[in-house]
Amino acid sequence: MVTATTTPPQCWRGLPALARAPPPLSSPLRPRAVAAAAPIYPLRRRIAITTTRGRRGTLDCSPRCTLETAGPGFDPLGLYEEGSNSLSRSPLSTFFGIMAPVFGSSSGGGASREKASGRGAAAAIEDSSIDIGDFFKGPLPGKFLKLLGFLALSRLGVYIPLGGVNREAFAGNLDQNSLLGTLDSFSGGGIGRLGICSLGIVPFINAQIVFQLLAQLYPKLQDLQRKEGEAGRKKVLQYTRYASVGFAIVQAIGQVLYLRPYVNDFSTEWVLTSVTLLTLGSVFTTFIGERISDLKLGNGTSLLIFTSIISYLPASFGRTVAQAFQDGNYVGLLTIILSFLLLVLGIVYVQEAERKIPLNYASRYSSRTGELQRSAYLPFKVNSSGVMPIIFSTSSLALPGTLARFSGLDFLKKAAIALNPGGALYLPTNVLLIAFFNYYYTFLQLDPDDLSEQLKRQGASIPLVRPGKSTAAYIKTVLNRISVLGSAFLAVLAAGPSLVEQTSHLTAFRGFAGTSVLILVGCATDTARKVQAEIISQKYKNIEFYDVNRFGQ
């Protein structure tokens, strides 16, 4: 038996005659009369429905939702703009439509409500029903306290210095090395302070780079990441941890050898103690990063670097301002500030840019038009890889210098000088590495073949594209084009600050260039997005979608 409740007459206001008429007899959702005792007129939030295939669903019986569902184009989530209703709405009516669930009367009598925006009920809930009080109702306060505790713990090791080193002389040498200055900003000043956690998360990042390159050379390792799912990724992560310990030992030895001119008593005991402390500090920082990732409020590696850059920002900005006032270069200071603001705006714009591919679902059939209705889309971000290519590129450029300090080979020393910021090979090598890591990381996160198979299993298809290999080829083409745009964007970030420095004749934010701004903006937007998703999921847990007994059905 096909059952559904009839739409109340007061919900028909403003609808065309065709929309008021009952569905045809061949419709999979054919209404029947409801008993007189059943209250059908009050404005209910949800009414249960049952179709011939035994599927359960809900029908929003408020006037705003009836206007959305009764029209010829059923688009409750408002993912498409080609509907006639969306073309005729004004921005003012859209605003009042979104705010209607918040300020509207729950009794339904007397006052008429504005139509909701074409984005639908789900978007209205997301946009208008989240306030500051919702943050304190779920587990988010506890998660944020844990996050702040982990971040404070990671900063503690930066202020515990190695003994027996002339830090003033080393800090003066650090000012002359731009690449070390950049790495110092990533460690939050840990290298300049010679803290036991000065290596930070860099050894773990280097280990990730090596395993991602090995995955291209050894297909078994690539299959372990992709085909074995979560279990395979955990195995690769465990191997990466072991490799990061090896990288930490090598980098600790290199840093100790680099500190030799500034050490009062360079003995074997001091070397072993310092290498052990630096290695343990790196392992400890990596452990904290993984615990932060488990909170699902953002990537632990990115958040650790985010905290380090934030802690480094005041001193860096103060140094630039002091230099500008000392030289009387006020125009250059204004140029740097304006460039910084434009850089932030550009990063936010590109970070939120998406390429949306519409999807058709075979199970979503419109009884009024007799056609399949598009009700979802596949989003691809222009900069889907985020800040990881820049972090990988910076760590790769620092690797020759570390190896040169460890081995003392002349060609490595020359390569390190050429790859330093301002060197002959720094800019082209940095751009090429960013493009490579961006392309690779994009396809590491999104496998076109796997994505095509998932769409096929879910009964979804891209319009005018055959399921299977054709869909995979189409997705690969889209990702190729997106990766080119993302690489160009990241290359501009890498090259832009040096051009600003040449124009303003100031050392603009030593170690705090476009890469650091991208990390800050990317981490902030990612964390805000995940907090919003957590609040919305918490609110949906309290919604009763199939409360049939409540209405006597």
UniProtKB/Swiss-Prot annotation:
Membrane topology reported for the UniProt record: Multi-pass membrane protein
GO cellular component: chloroplast thylakoid membrane
Superkingdom: Eukaryota
Keyword Transmembrane helix: yes
HAMAP family noted in UniProt: SecY (MF_01465)
Family designation: Belongs to the SecY/SEC61-alpha family.
Protein name as annotated: Preprotein translocase subunit SECY, chloroplastic
Gene: SECY
